[in-house]
Amino acid sequence: MLKNDRLLRALRRQPVDRTPVWLMRQAGRYLPEYRATRARAGSFLGMAKNPDIACEVTLQPLERFPLDAAILFSDILTIPDAMGLELYFVEGEGPKFRHPVRDADAIHRLGVPDMETELRYVMDAVRLIRRELDGAVPLIGFSGSPWTLACYMIEGGGSKEYARIKAMAFNAPQLLHHLLSTVTDAVIAYLSAQRAAGAQALQVFDTWGGVLSPAMYREFSLPYLTRIAQELERGSGEERTPLVLFGKGNGAYVSELAASGAEAVGVDWTISLADAAERAGGRVALQGNLDPATLYGSPDAIRSEVGKTLDSYAYGNGGSREGHVFNLGHGMSPDMNPDHVGVLVEAVQTLSKR
């Protein structure tokens, strides 16, 4: 039995006593306790692949702040790693793959990993976190989107130009669709396994959807997000596990994402929540969308921006605050002040009371 079900109620667009709040990368390098755990574990992957440490890190922000959800500590690149691409991290450069997929042979060899063998460490972490939370708040599981995962899988790491994957989109679109279809199968299986292990809400991160032109987004990202929303078994009624589709730079597509079958759409700060709510038309809950850079501001500036964000949603939603989950428009950065995060959380709680 959940002691705090605000998040789930808001995602179902049901009344809540105040707007729920959680933050992308709420467990991260801005916390000194996270940095201490990382030093002990030796590396990011040393934390993510150890269920006990993943559980410890997941719970750290909840011990500091009265957040309304925990989100699994993991990485979006666990799926391609389990497919054999071999994930590693370079200090200052981020994630890389030793075996990127760039031709038909490599792409056709890919299969959906077994979730309770190759990715058992993730499922064990979900089970352990649920046990440790003991119903305090819901646990969010997540995956990268097919397009975003394909970007890393083809580029071999992060990219500024996305030259290789865009070249494939123009020169061999059917090959790219084959890859995206395989990755979509894997994402559905991965989220389904997290749900079975105990995740109570699910989020798909389409981090790089915003690098696409509208026509390319509608060909190479949106159909696969829609497939996830429609094919991922989530139960029904009050037992249904809500699905959030989050995208960076997805403001132009809120109406289409709202028609996907997902319960909620997460947006960044490049669209106002008023505009997003009007486009959503009451079909889904919305999550977002404070610019993370607001946390560099003074406490008064943070409170002011939190108030504007809450009011913007209500303005676009016919005066109602229901159906809104407060979050940042993207993840926090390592140099952010934990005290300012506390100011943000307190401001949401105070200013959104019904």
Swiss-Prot record:
The organism encoding this protein is Xanthomonas campestris pv. campestris (strain ATCC 33913 / DSM 3586 / NCPPB 528 / LMG 568 / P 25)
GO molecular function terms attached to this record: uroporphyrinogen decarboxylase activity
Q: List the disulfide bonds.
A: none
Instruction: From the Swiss-Prot or TrEMBL record, state where the protein is found.
Output: Cytoplasm
Look at the named UniProt entry and state the broad enzyme category this protein falls under.
Answer: lyase
PROSITE patterns according to UniProt: UROD_1, UROD_2
NCBIfam families documented for this protein:
hemE (TIGR01464)
Biological role: Catalyzes the decarboxylation of four acetate groups of uroporphyrinogen-III to yield coproporphyrinogen-III.
- Give the site residues for Transition state stabilizer: D75
Q: Which GO terms describe its cellular component?
A: cytosol
Task: State the pathway, as annotated in the record.
Answer: Porphyrin-containing compound metabolism; protoporphyrin-IX biosynthesis; coproporphyrinogen-III from 5-aminolevulinate: step 4/4
UniProt xrefs under CDD domains: URO-D
The residues that hold substrate are R25, Q26, A27, G28, R29, F44, D75, Y152, T207, H330
Record text on subunit structure and interactions? Homodimer.
User: Which PANTHER family does this UniProt record tie to the protein?
Assistant: METHYLTETRAHYDROFOLATE:HOMOCYSTEINE METHYLTRANSFERASE RELATED (PTHR21091), UROPORPHYRINOGEN DECARBOXYLASE (PTHR21091:SF169)
Q: Which reaction does it catalyse?
A: uroporphyrinogen III + 4 H(+) = coproporphyrinogen III + 4 CO2
**Coiled-coil regions in this chain?**
none
Q: Which GO terms describe its biological process?
A: heme biosynthetic process; protoporphyrinogen IX biosynthetic process from glutamate
Q: Which UniProt keywords apply?
A: Cytoplasm, Decarboxylase, Lyase, Porphyrin biosynthesis
An example of a Pfam family matching this protein is: URO-D
InterPro entries recorded = UROD/MetE-like_sf, Uroporphyrinogen_deCO2ase_HemE, Uroporphyrinogen_deCOase
Q: What's the EC number here?
A: 4.1.1.37
Annotated protein name in UniProt:
Uroporphyrinogen decarboxylase
Q: Which family is this sequence assigned to?
A: Belongs to the uroporphyrinogen decarboxylase family.
